[in-house]
Amino acid sequence: MLAKAKYRKDYKQPDFTVTDIYLDFQLDPKHTVVTAITKFQRLNNEATSLCLDGHSFQFSSIKFNGEPFSDYQQDGESLTLDLKDKSADEFEIEIVTFLVPAENTSLQGLYQSGEGICTQCEAEGFRQITYMLDRPDVLARYITKITADKTKYPFLLSNGNRIASGELEDGRHWVEWNDPFPKPSYLFALVAGDFDLLQDKFITKSGREVALELYVDRGNLNRATWAMESLKKAMKWDEDRFNLEYDLDIYMIVAVDFFNMGAMENKGLNIFNSKFVLANPQTATDDDYLAIESVIAHEYFHNWTGNRVTCRDWFQLSLKEGLTVFRDQEFSSDTGSRAVNRINNVKFLRTVQFAEDASPMSHPIRPEKVIEMNNFYTVTVYEKGAEVIRMLHTLLGEQGFQKGMQLYIAENDGKAATCEDFVSAMERANNLDLNQFRRWYSQSGTPELLISDAYDEKTHTYRLTVSQSTPPTADQMEKVNLHIPLKVALYDANGTKQMLQHNGELLSDVLNVTEKDQVFEFHGIYGRPIPALLCDFSAPVKLDYDYKTEQLLGLLKFADNQFIRWDAAQMLFAQELRRNVVRFQQGEALEISPEILTALSYVLNHYEKDIELATLILTLPKEMEFAESFKTIDPDGISAARAFMQAQIAESLKDDFLRVYTHIRLNDYQVTQQDIALRVMRNLCLTYLAYTNLGNNLVQKHYNNANNMTDTLAALSVATKAALLCRDVLLADFEQKWQHDGLVMDKWFALQATRPDDNVLEIIQLLMDHPSFNFNNPNRLRSLVGSFANHNLKAFHNVSGSGYRFLTDVLIRLNESNPQVAARLIEPLIRFSRFDAQRQTLMKRALERLSVVENLSKDLFEKIEKALQ
């Protein structure tokens, strides 16, 4: 196929805009009639034609100012109206279209989810409903009338406030909604269905009462309470921290089972993947609870950073997403453990985003070129985008950052803005030059800091030499110097933190790295210090400093920055694993350093000082986390070395793990920071003990005694990964209990996909026919196929190529039904350059097979083309 790219530099204001749109939906899963009456306003007096976006529906009729209109041309993607004889500055167009929601497997536009009907319009889904100027810089007021069978669809929901309703004689009913705030078409939403409803209210700081409504499938009401409490907590936090108050009279959330993304921030009517709404102790883990709280907050925070201030064009996506991810991370940090949240965010960034930076899909947080916009809802735009916002916060401080936020909101409320508008507001509010900092928006790749040091004993001077570079990426060969905030601390041999000073003046602990090579000098340092570099992960960069084992052991023991203590452990683990991978490749015996075992024993035996941090330090990095530290990934070597280290740590510290495991006792399940920390530590001890002779009996007992899903899944997970004798019995028991609950079965499918068995692929292929598996449900696909391709390093990358062929078969099938999900699942295949020549050949062969598929979607074409070029 020949897919046309769009470029950021080509942005032009529209010739026309939309001021108001009236939508009438006559809903039926097999035949929905949509009437759209749209008021247009001319912006360019020279324009003689109006091109409206639209596809995937049956076009019925068009009227211009109430009269039939025939001066138009259609193609597969648009409707172009000839207006050379129509000079009015304002006019009205009425378009009627027919849709079949039941057959829309792409889950974009209007589609059937279970027994209900809903929409997903971001980024370009509205054009699958009717013809429209489907671009984010066209903001209009919406009135929506929905008519449907009352028995089947008792709830009819859309954006804004309910203004009217009624019943018809034929058993149908209707509801009309008015959203007074102009919004782009991607924020339109509609839901029709039969739900259980949880109602609550929130009183804003100005005294307004907001009705809160949370809709879930019948029978799930007891799993909705946590989501509602999370929403109220987020609304209060946004008022307190950002001084932002909700603006409508009602806020609705609907949970649906068939959803491509996590959730969608449609104005006043959020539509959520049920995974991020439903929770009770029997069905959801601690991680599920925390994820729900975070995603609920993220979508709510979009009300201001995304909806009230939206994006001018999709190249500016990080304007709303990077900022809102930063805001939801801060919410989680303020309401939970800041250190735990920071460390978990960094783990994800280093494993997933750094890999994307090094892949054929490398792009800046503000991309320059796009074929399929859905492909740029990426960890770079979201998570790296959030890191760029965080660096601004580090440079400006909380007070300066909030000054910039207030100016940004004041200047852009009700508008479609750009990344430049945001940086400019920060700059002007703080009287600071951010010209060099702007390069973070336009430069792709992961910067690297090469750091060396020297100590002058005579003058008590310590020097850090910092060199920055960014390796060439697939989209950019030439790189420039960035403004990198490098947060540091210095410790003496006894663990005492040194004052940072130069010529008698105190220095900030944030060093501004702006040149290719810079030297930072510290005076009054008595004795060669141990440097703590990149405290709190102050910039999304890779660090190259030759840490000695004893330095890392020192930081692990006495650093007062929790991130640094954890990161020291990560570096110790990585050093040990790299040595063992070399031994594995050379056929030598594997071994583990006694110093590491001693250090881990110390952390374990003092865990009560900081339970959460101790657990994070003691957790062995996953295979994919280790893989990121290798230029060429050896799946077999990494898998063997990690398994050896896990077993050795378990055996060496068995008595300590057993003592802590036995000591921790919890009664009734509660989602509190303290209880979560204790459960995580206890289950970590269980994980290690599973690799000792105590494992089978202990894990089986843990599973049988569990009174919550966190403990149940911990036992089931380690039984599977350690291939214990009890594994099959426990897996069968879990399946029998939960086979009718798709979300819970997702956990089971994911465990099956990551089991270490040689025949795991055969097991997965059989599970594709499991009664609980549905190929058209993205959650099921991600749990089984996605878990295998992304988290079973050794099996997916088997040298036979069987894993690659399996994924290719799935992608060919998905290309027709849901190309957006296909484009997510293809990611492990396009990163072939990180592997050896044999595996590269097999992965390229799989991509070449995909490239010749008939009617290849733009979603897949873009990624395959970039990978193979």
UniProtKB/Swiss-Prot annotation:
Q: What is its EC number?
A: 3.4.11.2
PROSITE patterns associated with the record: ZINC_PROTEASE (PS00142)
Q: Name one Pfam family in it.
A: Peptidase_M1
> What reaction(s) does this enzyme catalyze?
Release of an N-terminal amino acid, Xaa-|-Yaa- from a peptide, amide or arylamide. Xaa is preferably Ala, but may be most amino acids including Pro (slow action). When a terminal hydrophobic residue is followed by a prolyl residue, the two may be released as an intact Xaa-Pro dipeptide
Q: Which GO terms describe its cellular component?
A: plasma membrane
Cofactor(s) of this protein: Zn(2+)
Question: What binding details are noted for the cofactor?
Answer: Binds 1 zinc ion per subunit.
Q: According to UniProt, where does the site described as Transition state stabilizer lie?
A: Y382
Which of UniProt's keywords are assigned here? Answer: Aminopeptidase, Cell inner membrane, Cell membrane, Hydrolase, Membrane, Metal-binding, Metalloprotease, Protease, Zinc
GO biological process entries = proteolysis
* UniProt xrefs under Gene3D superfamilies: 2.60.40.1840, 3.30.2010.30, Neutral Protease Domain 2, Peptidase M1, alanyl aminopeptidase, C-terminal domain, tricorn interacting facor f3 domain
Disulfide pairs here are none
Role played = Aminopeptidase N is involved in the degradation of intracellular peptides generated by protein breakdown during normal growth as well as in response to nutrient starvation.
Tell me the protein family, please: Belongs to the peptidase M1 family.
Name recorded for this polypeptide: Aminopeptidase N
Q: What is the protein's species of origin?
A: Haemophilus influenzae (strain ATCC 51907 / DSM 11121 / KW20 / Rd)
Q: What is the lineage of its organism?
A: Bacteria, Pseudomonadati, Pseudomonadota, Gammaproteobacteria, Pasteurellales
